């Protein structure tokens, strides 16, 4: 457990007690502090490492509650709402005792980041919504279904396609950590623009990624509804919206909508990326964040 304030931003892994729960995070790089919130929910943090950003930012990669080395809620697997996640981030920023931070959220982490920025704008120096969306639900799933069909058509005849599509189809119905991890590893090619053409680059990541089951329900068993469209029009935090052209789950349609909704935001579409532009086009990704 890291206890001394001077050590909280030293390089490496840290554990702190926040609101009675153990919170784990990892520090790399130097410069202004940027908290990075991974997707999932439940996916291990390390896929989100972005060495290019670490050249000019102190990256604080958060392991969200219920994930990896961070403690589970008593209501696990329920209760991991955006409000609860944002509360944890506020406590972490307080403990770090730093000025307003940069905040980068990827995928589900983007949903958390935009909630945080909307409710705690005074804590945020700049916001990066990376593969996020302003709303989820039926419309979001319909768009994802159409994008998956496009992916399947582009990759027709690939030996690994049936397994990847099966993983995508089954992952949402699983509640066992090991089975979810297996399905996640199976479906990962769908989340890249050109996975099979670049398999040597991404094979190790696919083999090591893990996921814990976290539901989409609050502690009372009610859905944690995401629809930020109205409130995003009031967001005054400087915001960069990033999306991969070939992302099937939070692609350009949602990035463009975020950009339209958020005043004075910037939009960058990574033309040869899927869901993981920081891995697929790291130089372009880094340049967009640095700008």
Which residues does each predicted region cover?
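Flexible "cap/lid" loop of the alpha/beta hydrolase fold
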Residues: 127-171
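Acidic catalytic loop of the alpha/beta-hydrolase fold
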Residues: 246-250
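Short beta-strand/loop motif that positions the catalytic acidic residue
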Residues: 235, 241-243
